[in-house]
Regions:
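Short, surface-exposed, charged amphipathic helix/loop patches that serve as local interaction elements
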Residues: 1-94
Length: 94
């Protein structure tokens, strides 16, 4: 999935017009890593497909960026990416 930002996004000195998400490259280890990261922050996702935090972290892994980048996006871009992450997760039977 290639997300085209509504407006270019600047983050840590880099300007992004698009961001590519490689959902099919995610592994079980990535999912466990996300859960562990959330637990370290005292966050828990009882239903990962409904957790904005879980989905943002999953999207970040799929795009090869930090979750802080995804979380810093404007709401319209964040929401679109979160929904794409949810669609992917549900399509896998998670």
């Amino acid at each position: 999935y290639v997300h085209t930002f509504r407006r270019p996004v600047k983050f840590e000195g880099t300007t992004y017009k698009t961001l590519t998400f490689y959902w099919d490259r995610l592994t079980g280890a990535d999912m466990i890593s996300i859960e562990n990261e959330m637990q370290d922050m005292n966050e828990y996702a009882l239903s990962p497909e409904m957790s904005a935090s879980f989905l943002a972290k999953m999207a970040a892994k799929a795009a090869g960026v930090g979750s802080d980048f995804i979380e810093a996006l404007p709401v319209p871009d964040f929401t679109k990416i979160r929904n794409e992450a949810r669609s992917f997760l549900v399509s896998t039977g998670y």
